[in-house]
Amino acid sequence: MWTPSRRQLCLAFLLVCVLSAGSFFFHLNGGNFFRNGLTLSVLCSDYHLLKSPVAMVCLPHPLQTSNGSPSCPEQSSSLSGTWTITPGGRFGNQMGQYATLLALAQLNGRQAFIQPEMHAALAPVFRISLPVLDPEVDSLTPWQHLVLHDWMSEEYSHLEDPFLKLSGFPCSWTFFHHLREQIRREFTLHNHLREGAQYLLSGLRIGPAGIRPHTFVGVHVRRGDYLEVMPNRWKGVVGDRAYLQQAMDWFRARHKDPIFVVTSNGMKWCLENIDTSHGDVVFAGNGQEGTPGKDFALLTQCNHTIMTIGTFGFWAAYLAGGDTVYLANFTLPDSEFLKIFRPEAAFLPEWVGINADLSPLQAQFDPWKPDSLFRLV
């Protein structure tokens, strides 16, 4: 008669224990595995990249640090469905898309996922937490599509589609301001960017006497393609020399020993047009649009902000806090831009607007000018 050895008995006992534990775990959590089909996915920690075919995968941060937070938050059992947004535009645009997706998904009880392209744009700069949508799942999901306009509407509070792909270029505080602290956490700089910006700022001095500044004012001057787009497409202007002078004087009148830290994608123009006679202006940005992290970090580590136009300046001001001066009324009243842009939804009520000088545009589009009459004929 065969008698099992002690080793065989131990192995059999261990096998029974494993099967029992697995059965208990399945019955305890099994409903959670398949409740939402494609929406419920295997989520990975920040330092794991799963190789097996799973519904959703979190990509690792390209700049993983010991103090980095996980990119995949614990998923709330109250959230269902799968929402995402089509990334588009540049750095500030994608920040607006990220924040709007997060806010609308929470408002409607849905789980938000970002596209790999958005993760690649934002994760090198911020410790973002939204998980990343696997491309294969993206291609198989029966999406409903919604193009967002750039202000919060009541209809966005009652969106019932469980699989929704948003699009557009939302960047209005009306979507996410009620979650301001959460948004600030999402857009927390990686330590090396924050510390690098603070190191640069700590070494700045005012004038020949080397006065240590009491107040740091970040200045973002948007130029680049806007020099053509604003006047030719939108009947608008960008911030000019006179506007920047007024904005700086506004801060000089209200803050002791301010220093102005200028960043721009048109630094040559800034060097030639910004008045440096007070000895309180520093041209610190590198203007590299492909790697915006350093310029953005500098702006957000300042106490206050001067912005011209654009989402990059908006986000710098929003995250820096403090006082913000912005360029107001920068288009003609009949501009098509005002059909997609509402100033009251773009700028916080406490921010200070300085009206743009529209006289060059008014002369250009004056219907009674001889060349305008010639065009009409």
Curated annotation (Swiss-Prot):
- Keywords assigned by UniProt, alphabetized: Glycoprotein, Glycosyltransferase, Golgi apparatus, Lipid metabolism, Membrane, Signal-anchor, Transferase, Transmembrane, Transmembrane helix
Q: Which residues are glycosylated?
A: 67, 303, 329
**Tissue expr:** In the adult, highly expressed in pancreas, testis and epididymis and to a lesser extent in thymus, lung, stomach, small intestine, colon, spleen and uterus. Not expressed in brain, heart, skeletal muscle, kidney, liver and bone marrow. Expressed in epididymis and testis.
The processes (GO biological process) annotated in the record are:
cellular response to glucagon stimulus; cellular response to glucose stimulus; cellular response to low-density lipoprotein particle stimulus; cellular response to xenobiotic stimulus; endoplasmic reticulum unfolded protein response; endothelial cell apoptotic process; fucosylation; lipid metabolic process
Q: Which residues lie on this side of the membrane: Cytoplasmic?
A: 1-8
Grouped into one coarse class, the protein's main location is Golgi
> Cytoplasm: present as a keyword of the record?
no
Q: Which Pfam families match?
A: Glyco_transf_11
Chain segments annotated as transmembrane: 9-26
Glycoprotein listed as a keyword:
yes
EC code(s) of this entry: 2.4.1.69, 2.4.1.344
Highest taxon in the source lineage: Eukaryota
Q: Which family does it belong to?
A: Belongs to the glycosyltransferase 11 family.
**Full protein name:** Galactoside alpha-(1,2)-fucosyltransferase 1
Taxonomic lineage is:
Eukaryota, Metazoa, Chordata, Craniata, Vertebrata
